[in-house]
Amino acid sequence: MSAKKSTKDSKEQNTPLGGLVLAETPITFNENKPVTKVKVRNTGDRPIQVGSHFHFFEVNRALEFDRAAAYGKRLNISSTTAIRFEPGDETEVPLIPFGGKQTLYGFNNLVDGWTGEGVVPNSERPDKLAAIRLAAERGFKSSK
């Protein structure tokens, strides 16, 4: 058994019930994903909360920001967390592209399909311009 291993084991053994054993190095996530920052303003009269994996392009229509820049992206925050936008507040948020197949369905049904860039998989035809037009028709605010 190495000295490092026994030190770790002794830390765990000497930790009181309910105590915490922290890693020696910080935990990171989404390190290699490109980040897009957008300024968001809540034009509504109520707070709006957006979860970590909600397609940001399709968030509440009272949030005003560059929706085209948010197409295919989500908040760069840890899973199961959210950001709250108070009425009248303006804040800048970091967005990252969805991982995996980048096929998004539901939310506010503005996209319902592939949101990636480059070669189109499975004969899907992303239509970003149609989604932007549909968002405008349905009253989703955009700063551009």
From Swiss-Prot:
Q: What's an example of a GO molecular-function annotation for this chain? A: urease activity
Coiled-coil intervals: none
Origin species, per record, is: Yersinia pestis
Q: What keywords were assigned to this record?
A: Cytoplasm, Hydrolase
Its protein name is Urease subunit beta
InterPro entries in alphabetical order: Urease_beta-like, Urease_betasu_sf, Urease_subunit
One cellular component term from this protein's GO annotations in UniProt:
urease complex
Q: What is its main location?
A: cytoplasm
State whether it acts alone or in a complex, and with which partners, per the record: Heterotrimer of UreA (gamma), UreB (beta) and UreC (alpha) subunits. Three heterotrimers associate to form the active enzyme.
- Where is the protein found, in the record's own terms? Cytoplasm
This protein's source sits in the domain of life called: Bacteria
CDD domains in the record, alphabetically? Answer: Urease_beta (cd00407)
Query: Taxonomic lineage of this organism?
Result: Bacteria, Pseudomonadati, Pseudomonadota, Gammaproteobacteria, Enterobacterales
> Quick one: which gene encodes this?
ureB
Supply the enzyme class, top level: hydrolase
The family assignment reads: Belongs to the urease beta subunit family.
Q: Name one GO biological process term.
A: urea catabolic process
Please state the pathway this protein functions in, per its UniProt record: Nitrogen metabolism; urea degradation; CO(2) and NH(3) from urea (urease route): step 1/1
